[in-house]
UniProtKB/Swiss-Prot annotation:
Protein EC: 2.7.-.-
Taxonomic source organism: Shewanella loihica (strain ATCC BAA-1088 / PV-4)
Localization in the cell: Cell inner membrane
Topological type in the membrane: Multi-pass membrane protein
Residues annotated as the enzyme's active site: 287 (proton acceptor)
Name of the featured protein: Probable protein kinase UbiB
Main location: membrane
Amino acid sequence: MTIKSMRRAYQVVKTVLQYGLDDLIPAKLKPWYFRLLRWSFFWLTNQHKDKVGGERLKLAMQELGPVYIKFGQMLSTRRDLLSDEWAEELAMLQDRVPPFDSAIARAQIEAELGAPIETYFDNFDDTPLASASISQVHTATLKSNGEEVVLKVLRPNVEEKVHADLLLMTQSAQVLETLLGHGNRLRPAEVVEDYRTTIEGELNLKLEALNAIKLRNNFIDSGALYIPKMYEEFCFTRLIVMERIYGVPVSDRAALEAQGTNLKLLAERGVELFFTQVFRDNFFHADMHPGNIFVSTEHPEDPFYIGLDCGIMGTLTEQDKRYLAENFLAFFNRDYTRIAQLYIESGWVAADTDLVAFEQAIKVVCEPMFNKPLDEISFGHVLLELFRTARRFDMVVQPQLVLLEKTLLYIEGLGRQLYPQLDLWQTAKPFLESWMAEQMGPLGMAKKIKKQFPYWTDKLPELPELVYDNLKMGKNFVNSQNQLLDRYLKQQQKAHKSNYLLITSAVLVICGSILFSQNATLWASYACIGIGATLWLLGWRSRPKNRKF
């Protein structure tokens, strides 16, 4: 460990102790060496005893900086692990940091371009349009055609800082997991690994550009979502250039009302967009918080969304999609047995899970939800409560489902903020039923056959050989089983013969001993003992030498 990393480790420990985060661990889970370590930092005391645990954690992450802020934001979406109070506190964390020097930004951009900025751009604005923990955004115009663009560039040395903090997080999570026990539902090491995957994806701007291009192509003819154009010739690992857009932040309801936006249509389109991305395209924007979503200013009566920041995207397997759709339909049909079966069939929980107990646990959680009208039931909270219940039955964390749950909660919150009367079930049910019918119907079967056709065409020439090999293998297996059976029967015959001789010898020896003790004729007693001894020797020599068959 370098001096620099040791200094950072001390800073983290200092912050943790001054915010009393160690006090949140139950005393029974603190072994003697943990208490000794805590005592060795006796001068660092809890300065925030008046604050609740969730607030202390939020403030500590805020003080530790950008990597921990983003980690806190990610944790706020893990409501299957945290209580609602803690999750809401962490959701308040803001990824806002002071901009870095524009001269450094220029140098970073020119290093990626391999030329001065003025070679390709005019009107480069040294004052950043926005600044976050990972990157910074500047505006300019393309020299070739005068189009307005934004340049997004990574912060200097951000990769080194992120990886150093991730290493500390991983080590801390391993210690915490040891204290809590590996069976604890929090599974800190698993959570940190999930975060590592997310944030490392954000460090590659080229990947973000490719994601944006794919999402843009998926909705190129859509009147519901617009993704800004990426200029691929200027997209690199540490720099991307995209079309500049103008819109109203989706969280600014007053501005949307002022321009006469059809909020009901906008809210319904948000739900439709989510299900289209998940079920039609299997490629969904997984970071749809209000800062990344804008609304068009043109045609407010027929509004569309503008999506930014495609660094975090989610995908599901075909199996996951089918189970998810069936889950929602089973929930609204109150078929809790089917929900439990789906979790087991999908492999999300172990096959040996007690189905009856699992079904009862799901029913206890879900049934009270139906005390509310259907239009007030939250899809996101349904999924969340099901995940929480499944975690009690050792559900393995599915990162793709965590992203989906987070996105669904964002979309629902957004939709109800725009239009409180939004009925998600009525909006989503036709889509889900149509998708399920398509998957199970002739068209769905034809698509699956078409998808698998190239594979089977490639394998077809090998089929006769595979059939022959399997038949030969089966024949050899039968022959080997027959040989084993013959060996087994012969060994059993030997064993029976040996046992017969040994038992007979024992009887004769006993009889000879009795005759001898009764002063009977000596030759009779000696004969019994002698024959018995001979039979014992024959029986011993005829026993099976190797009992393995």
